[in-house]
Amino acid sequence: MSSAVSAAETEVVPQMLSLERASGQSLSVKALLNEDQAEVLAFLSLRPIHTVCMAGYILDHGVVSAQNRGIFYGCRGADGKLKGVALVGHATLIETQCDDALKAFAQLEHQYSRSHLIRGEHEMIQRFWGYYAKLGHQPRRACRELLFEQQAVPEIKGDIPALRTAMQADLDQVIKINADMIVSECGVDPLVKDGDGFRERVARRIDQGRVWVWSESGRLIFKADVFAETPEMIYLEGINVHGTQRGNGYGTRCLAQLGRILLQRSRSICLLMNERKELLGDFYKKAGYEFRGVYDTIYLHPQ
């Protein structure tokens, strides 16, 4: 496979766009191929905390894969050098410092009708949305999120929890926790929208050893998912402490212990939290996380 993810996706997303910059210089936006992998990873490695999800997809599946749930595009200047990289698909992610590339990616996203969300740094997404809204789009829901990073783990009093990677026997509990968290965040139930696909993706992540849990008597007390991993950065999501066990310090100790484990194989760990959940910020700071920036996630109307 070298030029497309699936027939369904390539029917609605063009493989190449060409446009003129305000300066008169040309830009081209083209679907990236597996042979572009080294160049793309080098570009993304310049800002690893902001590109870990895209880089993680590529390291896991390659540039071209149905498991990326979208198509990677590169925006190049007249000199052929990358000015930006975007994953256009279920979740649209963008990395660029070039405003003309943002405009080009907005035009590209306009031609893809099935995106669920667009996520990125606040200022970049605001500029992107300025171009995208002019094409007739309105958000279904917008969330402001705070980016945190952990590079070292503080000493925390209390027993060290016996964290382990989840097993397939934990699958149903993990699915329920993740589905409930997604409904709370964006209002869409993944078990209704794509139940089989959602279950398959969670099961695959468990098989990869990327779901960490602490359990007692068969009940998951703590859970966290490693969504993406590179040598420079790990991105966590789906962090959850069982409702009956909150406020006892279990979550802080589990998250700190998970940091000790993961920082042995990556330089940093990052995560996002909804800015409305202020108490979570204190929770992450106790576990050694520091604030790094502001993100926007814009949920789109399904078409």
Question: What positions do the PLM features span?
Answer:
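Conserved acetyl-CoA-binding loop-helix of GNAT-fold acetyltransferases
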Residues: 99-108, 241, 247-263, 282, ...
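Flexible, substrate/cofactor-facing loop regions flanked by secondary structure
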Residues: 158-233
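Conserved beta-strand-loop-alpha-helix junction that forms the acyl-donor binding cleft
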Residues: 119-125, 271-282, 297-303
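Short amphipathic alpha-helix that is part of the acyltransferase structural core
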Residues: 4-54, 153-191
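Conserved donor-binding loop and adjoining core beta-sheet/short helix segment
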Residues: 21-35, 42-117, 221-237
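Acyl-donor-binding surface of acyltransferase catalytic domains
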Residues: 2-18, 77-83, 87-161, 298
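Hydrophobic adenine-recognition pocket in adenosine-nucleotide-binding enzymes
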Residues: 239-241, 273
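Conserved GNAT acetyl-CoA-binding A-motif
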Residues: 113-122, 233, 262-273
